[in-house]
């Protein structure tokens, strides 16, 4: 399902990834383990499209997506820092991507409430600003936001931090 072939990523003269090759089959869970600074996050950001490699290809289901924009990849990501909007409500954070896809309000509402229940966020919590939640609750909001878009692939950067 996911194939990285000969991926090279550079930041200036620094080569962060050198000829990375990875194959992950459909249904598999895959973990990158390694010390800080070894390229785990860079690899995830390359898969999701936040970083474009200097060379090599990123393929999903045998389709080259190396130059496909982030919003067209249908890959979700939960960032290490969650990347939530702290002054927005939990509801609006989860609904953010759904609104960008221009779904109708009733459909957004149904999807937000359904996914919130799945990650154990109450209707009362949906009304709160994200900044009012604990770290664990914020992590669940980030997971819900990623799941709301029904991605084919879901990436977690430092999921236990």
Language-model segments: what does each one mean?
Residues 88-97:
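Short coil-to-helix segment of the ABC ATPase nucleotide-binding domain corresponding to the Q-loop/switch region
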């Amino acid at each position: 399902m996911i194939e990285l072939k000969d991926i090279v990523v550079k930041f200036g003269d620094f080569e962060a990834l050198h000829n990375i090759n990875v194959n992950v089959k459909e249904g598999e869970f895959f973990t990158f383990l390694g010390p800080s600074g070894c390229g785990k996050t860079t690899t995830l950001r390359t898969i999701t499209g936040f970083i474009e490699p200097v060379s090599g290809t990123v393929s999903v289901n045998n389709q080259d997506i190396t130059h496909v924009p982030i919003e067209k990849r249908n890959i979700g990501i939960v960032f290490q820092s969650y990347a939530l909007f702290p002054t927005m409500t939990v509801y609006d954070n989860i609904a953010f991507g759904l609104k960008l896809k221009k779904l109708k309000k009733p459909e957004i509402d149904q999807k937000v409430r359904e996914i919130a229940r799945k990650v154990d966020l109450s209707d009362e919590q949906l009304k709160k600003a994200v900044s009012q939640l604990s770290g664990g609750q914020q992590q669940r909001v980030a997971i819900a936001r990623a799941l709301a878009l029904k991605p084919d692939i879901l990436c977690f950067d430092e999921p236990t931090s």
